[in-house]
């Protein structure tokens, strides 16, 4: 494997960069976060972590118990015999366990002795080297002094000789002078060489003594290490290899006797030893396995594929710095690291191979023109459904609760310009997911904006959805029949969202329409046809169908019903349809008017019956040829979703511990939610979850499509939840449970009412809040002494009212010096309940006698404040 940076390695194993850098530093590897690490450095880190956490090797049994049973027959006479059975049980304790203390003491003593011997040897060598160096230095100094004396003597002698030679040279010839000079030079050179040789010998002797001392210390250290390694190796062999000799010596002659026909025979010691031989043979080399890894795998499944216990995998992950549980789901990268760490090989597999195979089996045909799919989007009450209603010549808006659309309505309309498929999306803020789903399934978006209302929050959201999906936008300015209509204002506000009309030099068509009078409807249909021609929409008209689930619900009489928009191919009755984790054979298809349809082509919305369950809205719908493959894919998707859900529910993470501890004081409002269609369940769940605050949390303990059943009521009773039904009702068995358990059951048909009432319920769960409100202030004018009550303050009420039963504060120079309660309140000699502004009174403060003239007595009351979300 190539070198990787510490940041990449930390991301792969799922730990922080700072922690990994610290672990490298502890292992004597100093690295920065952006530096690379080699395989040797990673192995060194793993060795260090392994030493820190301890080994995982298996131990041999510490004791062994042998049981022997011998049977003999005792003759009591000619015709009577008694069977005698002798049972013997012996326990053998492993020698290393019995002598563990003694061996440990001997080993400690031996180690100390060796260490002491090594220290003494090093000390002796150092002293010897020091003595040798001092002696040689002394000899060198003496030699130097002697040489200096000799040099001075020679110099004096040479001086005399030079003077004598000078006297002689004056009488010598030039040849004789040259010969004398040569002899003198040679003598000087010989003397210098002798001095250099003696100095070199002194240095070599000192160096040799130091080397001998160092080698002696190294030899002692090496022998001590070899002895330590030999001892450890011997202990390891004693732990893992069992000798037959001890078992043979432990068995005596009585243990190997058997009785056969009244005669006793002894087994040979060779046979006895063979019976006691250990049956397990140590593997000659490590077993290396090849593990097939998908996108996710649980710890228990990974251990099963490695043929080891799950605890071994958890230990390996702990050594890598990752905490895990036996049911935790690991991603592919983490699983690869664990497999490599444990010395095995891996093979990556594609979890979607079966789905890819289904797509490859799809029957396709040549492309042909298809009708456009148009989604009508906009703010609530801007007239989207009324506009579509006028086009369809039917009354749809009147059937929606509260006059607002709460489902995606899919309609196919025949116009003079050809067939058009319309999708009507809700405009309420809670239906964001449904609007986004409509934008991804559409070709053209019609943005309906009321001319008298302008751009609203959901209008902006619709523009964002269309831009994100890359779908062309046509703006329909509705309600032009009203006097307050102002289309120019709509253009101005939309231009701020980068939606500019063609009249202003942009690329978006603006059409003024009125859903009430029909004004501009034809122009709108022409704009749709023109935009569809520019897009040149095509799809295969025959072959295997493919589409998207627009909406789904559970019908009491017909079972799961899914609204499917066919995008390509032909969907026929009898086809096997796969929608997410649900599948089934299409039993019947119906259009938006409830009429049966035999074949549905591209851009045709139909209701499909016959699925195994209610599919999730927004899932792709695909016709497959083999029902068995469809079942396999659905089962695999379901298992994958379950693993993802399980991974989200992991609460054993250390980083979540403190968050869970802090959340202990948060109140929870549990809700069991049932709605008529899947889209409403999603929208209501998201809206209610967003209502959660730091003090009150909304918890959806159960949700689903269809009526309220006995199971839902039991779940609500067990979790102390309220049951909310949106356009659904409870059956008879559920009502019985609800009445018996006194569960709060509420029905709604408009999402506004549902959210408002849940808000009110959450407000009632808020902890009460109190505040102090000052109701009166009295100034101390004089202080009197009372034998019963102590100091009595003669006061004048300067603000508000002084009440007897309320708490007070004593202020001196506007600083609170005491807080307590009134013990006595009198007007003249009479006890009174309250004294108003401008009236004198006597006040006795309970357990406080240090009242002085000029102090102020402040009276307050504690008032509960109504909390709001």
UniProtKB/Swiss-Prot annotation:
Entry keyword Cytoplasm: yes
GO cellular component: cytosol
Pfam families, per database record: EF-G_D2, GTP_EFTU, GTP_EFTU_D2, IF-2, IF2_assoc, IF2_N
Name of the protein this chain belongs to: Translation initiation factor IF-2
Ranges where the record places region G2: 403-407
CDD domains, alphabetized: IF2_eIF5B, IF2_mtIF2_II, mtIF2_IVc
HAMAP family linked: IF_2_B
Ranges where the record places region G3: 424-427
Positions of region (G5): 514-516
Spans annotated as G4: 478-481
PROSITE patterns linked to this entry: G_TR_2, IF2
Subcellular location(s) per record: Cytoplasm
Family listed: Belongs to the TRAFAC class translation factor GTPase superfamily. Classic translation factor GTPase family. IF-2 subfamily.
Positions of the tr-type G domain: 369-542
Annotated GTP binding sites: 378-385, 424-428, 478-481
Chief subcellular location: cytoplasm
Comp. bias (Polar residues): 67-76
Residue ranges with Low complexity bias: 110-119
Phylogenetic lineage: Bacteria, Pseudomonadati, Pseudomonadota, Gammaproteobacteria, Alteromonadales
Protein keywords: Cytoplasm, GTP-binding, Initiation factor, Nucleotide-binding, Protein biosynthesis
Gene Ontology molecular functions: GTP binding; GTPase activity; guanosine tetraphosphate binding; translation initiation factor activity
Region (Disordered): 51-78, 105-277
NCBIfam families: IF-2, small_GTP
Biased composition (Basic and acidic residues): 120-241
Record keyword Nucleotide-binding present: yes
Region feature (G1): 378-385
